[in-house]
């Protein structure tokens, strides 16, 4: 049932929905929806020491396949789908500021939080 709900998001197909459901397993194990990003390795690496404060690339912890599939879903949403929705407009607005690759990673992270919240609520995606 959850896979059908997840597939209502533009760019998310059977493969993405099944991989996400398999990686998460139980949506209630995450206290907040925002905790899914670090779990999937879709957050920036941080290095701090004294006055030094560097942000690195994504942390790439666990779930390598799921992270790759979410990246592909973000790519499909941004580059191939013609659905006009708030998520796509948000991602397109990021491209001039941070570049395509970082915008795709940010969209993949946003997709993961969206999919988790949809799975918890059982509500389908409604494009705006």
Question: Across the structure, where does each feature detected by a protein language model lie?
Answer:
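A detector of single, family-specific signature residues
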Residues: 1-128
């Amino acid at each position: 049932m959850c896979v059908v709900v997840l597939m209502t998001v533009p760019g998310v197909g059977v493969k993405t929905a099944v991989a996400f459901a398999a990686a998460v397993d139980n949506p209630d194990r995450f206290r907040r929806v925002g905790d899914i990003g670090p779990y999937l390795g879709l957050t920036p690496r941080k290095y701090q020491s004294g006055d030094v404060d560097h942000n690195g690339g994504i942390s790439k912890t666990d779930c390598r396949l799921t992270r790759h599939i979410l990246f592909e879903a973000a790519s499909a949403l941004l580059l191939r789908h013609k659905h006009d929705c708030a998520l796509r407009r948000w991602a397109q607005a990021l491209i001039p500021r941070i570049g395509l690759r970082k915008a795709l990673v940010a969209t993949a992270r946003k997709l993961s939080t969206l999919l988790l919240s949809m799975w918890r609520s059982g509500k389908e995606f409604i494009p705006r």
